[in-house]
Amino acid sequence: MISPALLERVACPVCLESAGCPQCSAPAGHAACRDDYVRRVRCACGGPDKVRLEARAEAALVCPCCGASYALRRHDGYADLGPVRPVGEVTQYADHEFQERLGTTDAEPVLSARVKADMMRRMLAPGAGEVVLDLGCGAGKLALYAGRDGARAAGVDVAPFFLAGAAAAVDLVRGDLRRLPFRKGAFPSAYSLDVLEHLDEPGVLDVLVEARRTVGPGGRLFVYTHAMESSALARFQRAVNRLARRLGQAGLIDHEREALRKSDHLNAIRSHEHFEALCAEAGLEVAERRYYNVVFKAVVEDLGLRLYEQARRRKPRPPEATEGRSANSLRASVKPPGALAMAAARALTWVLKLDVVLFGGVRTGPFFGLLRPRGGVQEGPHA
């Protein structure tokens, strides 16, 4: 949806106000935004605010600085605020056919998705009425769940393939996380799940910088991602994965969806120290961290769930069943799990939470992190 509150928060993704501290202020005009955006937005003060958009018609917003026009797609439930020119590589998640192959439903998150969502809610701890920004919200499924318990969620994603339920209940924006189209301090908190691994190192830094600016000096940012490390416990997961591959070769399970989901991973975060350095360069610090050693997940979800899915897999739909249909309508046609399956998944979710309860202090690659803005931005190689 596009609420009046969202329209108060949005801004041009690429234009900065001229006013700032002595280090980031600049003459008015788009030239200073175009030529000096990166340096100014990474200023230790948090950078200038972004230029507010002006309404020119019911379905359009215009930037008074660069002149770009942005559409309000009210029928589809989102504001189209992506930069006119691409910032970097465009993920395949923005591809219509790729999204159709992934598929999704608006069923509540369960299993590892629920573990991540509940860790976000525990560590971020949004208050009643607080609006939380989902950075890389995908179809908007988690944003729907994050809006429970009195908090509200807004979502931004590079691909506008949103679930109908999310488009009706959540403020949604199509935008690039590397150039967030929001005013400074627009949201008190934000989260990013399974997103940073899809970016190269400059992209990770850009997202952290933009997130810091968007949550403001007193804000909070939760991330789930992974560094290129592993613990001794990861050997068990690798053994399960080897077994799963053999079962896949025998036609007993299907790896396609998981392979698709990870197919454009760049895995730029080399270690936890590397991530901390990127955070420091972006003006953030890691306030809390828990590791995710996926012992129970490997058995229950990576192996058991795939065996179950293969057993109940329906025959493929004929091509004419999807021809000429939008991505949103294709998503709506994906068969949701039944009540019994959901009850079993909820129960198994508690088993998967043991991975955090028992092994959350054992250093490994995947981790949950709570980040907060720090006093100043450290100079780094990307400055």
Where in the sequence are the language-model features?
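S-adenosyl-L-methionine-dependent methyltransferase catalytic module, highlighting the catalytic core
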Residues: 201-210, 214-216, 220-370
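Conserved N-terminal segment of class I S-adenosyl-L-methionine
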Residues: 2-179, 183, 191-193, 205-208, ...
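Short, charged, solvent-exposed linker or helix-capping segments at domain edges/interfaces
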Residues: 219, 378-383
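Non-catalytic surface loops within mature trypsin-like serine protease
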Residues: 83, 160, 227, 293, ...
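Short catalytic micro-motifs in class I SAM-dependent methyltransferases
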Residues: 194-198
